[in-house]
């Protein structure tokens, strides 16, 4: 039987060990080197309290954060209200479709939060939310898959196999990480095939 995580309850109970109250270090490093066009539209699904989307918005990109938890989004709106190019909305990345696809999707701790049996849905959802030729930048947890989760583990090989049919892998590397996550994260940059 599949266990469904109640994300709203997790935020209500402050049971959010993944929330480090700052953007992912690997994302900050990548943003410091990126050469994206200023008009790039960015989506951050599973954004929680909005720390990662705020990093994109502070660089001038039109950024949207999306999450299942209204509590997390309310906190994000309050904390980052001074960023006019940052919007947050509730939604299910796997089940909804955008009015207009994005140029880039960034994710950190979403793939690992999804039941492994639904990961094919995740790969399909990327095709709805991302423009052909768009970029998918992700920091994935890489550790053995266990039944207990979230987070649910994955191997680099499983991740590559999941996304390679519709995406070209441009680069992958070990990113700078939060304390306590050494050897648990791997960063990928993909380009959606046309």
Give the label of every model feature segment.
Residues 103:
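Conserved acidic residues
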Residues 1-43, 48-100, 114-194:
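Class I (Rossmann-like) S-adenosyl-L-methionine-dependent methyltransferase catalytic domain
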Residues 106:
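A conserved beta-strand element that flanks and buttresses the S-adenosyl-L-methionine
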Residues 109-113:
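Short catalytic micro-motifs in class I SAM-dependent methyltransferases
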């Amino acid at each position: 039987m599949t266990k469904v995580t109640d994300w709203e309850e997790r935020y209500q109970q402050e049971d959010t060990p993944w929330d480090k109250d700052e953007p992912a270090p690997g994302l900050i490093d990548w943003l410091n080197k990126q050469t994206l066009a200023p008009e790039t539209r960015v989506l951050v699904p599973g954004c929680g309290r909005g720390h990662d989307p705020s990093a994109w918005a502070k660089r001038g990109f039109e950024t949207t954060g999306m999450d299942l938890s209204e509590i997390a989004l309310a906190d994000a709106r309050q904390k980052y209200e001074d960023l006019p190019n940052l919007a947050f909305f509730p939604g299910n990345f796997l089940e909804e479709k955008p009015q207009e696809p994005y140029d880039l999707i960034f994710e950190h701790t979403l793939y690992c939060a999804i039941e492994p049996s639904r990961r094919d849905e995740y790969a399909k959802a990327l095709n709805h939310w991302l423009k052909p030729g768009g970029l998918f930048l992700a920091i994935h947890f890489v550790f053995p898959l266990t039944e207990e989760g979230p987070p649910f583990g994955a191997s680099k090989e499983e991740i590559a196999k999941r996304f390679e049919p519709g995406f070209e892998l441009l680069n992958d590397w070990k990113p700078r990480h939060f304390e306590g996550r050494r050897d648990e994260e791997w960063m990928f940059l993909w380009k959606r095939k046309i």
